[in-house]
């Protein structure tokens, strides 16, 4: 049974807005296991700058790429439910490829609001490749997911798809966003299977939302002219369409906020980064 947005304690700060009132400010939850979802959030905010944004990340169970599908589904349901109990959500974006490949059906069954997922951009990469070799760079869970293999079977029959799963690259992206430096030698080691090929992929699918955060570093390691493709812009367009198609939404006056699952020294260090993205507060989500 779908869960409806909570409204019992929000009437003083939020109101049902009709088209005759001022432009509504519906609430969008962007969720990822870590900070990679900020790359998707940036794309969405460019199209929809006036939404009320919530960013939630699971720093307790991060990274998801090594977790079982059952664990991920239960965890994502728990987190989205906890956010929904405090905020009237208009839409949820699961900005995590690994979580999207396993949790979307369960989320859509439980909640009434639309849920958007992130999937590897196989189809556009196939259109862009010049040498017919496309690389999919993702977590191990995404690389081996049946959904990913189905995308390849449907859209890449005329191409050679080279799969490379790496949780180390996810950690590198987290390091960069926390202010650290990612040594190029680390990336070269991760990408060695491709770099050692006689004809490496000329188009790379960034199949994890963390990886667009490393495009500058990846460009220095990959062969010159290699194209990198992600699904952030497509997810933003889908989100904008779903928001615009809603007749009545609950408009929030709250500030943007970020939630983590535990507060520690790492989250303290991350707060200035989140503030630079437009999230002035970081709180522990009560789950």
UniProtKB/Swiss-Prot annotation:
Which intervals of the chain are annotated as region Disordered?
A: 1-25
What EC number(s) does this enzyme carry? Answer: 5.1.1.3
The reactions it catalyses are:
L-glutamate = D-glutamate
Q: Where is the active site?
A: 96 (proton donor/acceptor), 208 (proton donor/acceptor)
Give a GO molecular function annotation for the protein.
glutamate racemase activity
Pathway given in the UniProt record = Cell wall biogenesis; peptidoglycan biosynthesis
Task: Please note every region of biased composition (Polar residues).
Answer: 1-15
The broad enzyme category this protein falls into is isomerase
Leader sequence range is none
Residues given in the record as substrate binding sites: 32-33, 64-65, 97-98, 209-210
According to its UniProt entry, one GO biological process term is: cell wall organization
Keywords, ordered alphabetically: Cell shape, Cell wall biogenesis/degradation, Isomerase, Peptidoglycan synthesis
The record describes the protein's role as: Provides the (R)-glutamate required for cell wall biosynthesis.
**Entry's family note:** Belongs to the aspartate/glutamate racemases family.
Q: Which PANTHER family match?
A: GLUTAMATE RACEMASE (PTHR21198:SF2)
Q: What name is this protein filed under?
A: Glutamate racemase
Species of provenance: Yersinia pseudotuberculosis serotype IB (strain PB1/+)
Q: What is the lineage of its organism?
A: Bacteria, Pseudomonadati, Pseudomonadota, Gammaproteobacteria, Enterobacterales
**What is the primary gene name for this protein?**
murI
């Amino acid at each position: 049974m779908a869960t409806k947005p909570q409204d019992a304690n929000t009437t003083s700060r939020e109101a049902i807005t009709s088209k005759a009132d001022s432009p509504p400010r519906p609430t969008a939850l962007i969720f990822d296991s870590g900070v990679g979802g900020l790359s998707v959030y940036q794309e969405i905010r460019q199209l929809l700058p006036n939404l009320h944004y919530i960013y939630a990340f699971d720093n307790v169970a991060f990274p998801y790429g090594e977790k079982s599908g059952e664990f991920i589904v239960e965890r994502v349901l728990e987190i989205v439910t906890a956010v929904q109990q405090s905020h009237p959500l208009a839409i949820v974006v699961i900005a995590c490829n690994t979580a999207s490949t396993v949790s979307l059906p369960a989320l859509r069954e439980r909640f009434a609001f639309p849920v958007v997922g992130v999937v590897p951009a196989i189809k556009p990469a196939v259109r862009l490749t010049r040498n017919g070799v496309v690389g999919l760079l993702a977590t191990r869970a995404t690389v081996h997911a049946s959904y990913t293999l189905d995308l390849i079977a449907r859209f890449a029959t005329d191409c050679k798809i080279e799969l490379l799963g790496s949780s180390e690259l996810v950690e590198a992206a987290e390091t960069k966003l926390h202010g650290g430096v990612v040594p190029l030698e680390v990336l070269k080691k991760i990408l060695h299977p491709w770099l050692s090929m006689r004809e490496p992929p000329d188009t790379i699918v960034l199949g994890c939302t963390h990886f667009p955060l490393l495009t500058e570093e990846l460009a220095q390691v990959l062969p010159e002219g290699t194209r990198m493709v992600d699904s952030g812009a497509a997810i933003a367009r889908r989100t904008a369409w779903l928001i615009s198609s809603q007749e009545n939404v609950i408009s929030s006056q709250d500030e943007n906020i970020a939630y983590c699952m535990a507060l520690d020294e790492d989250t303290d260090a991350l707060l200035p980064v989140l503030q630079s993205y437009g999230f002035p507060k970081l709180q522990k989500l009560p789950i």
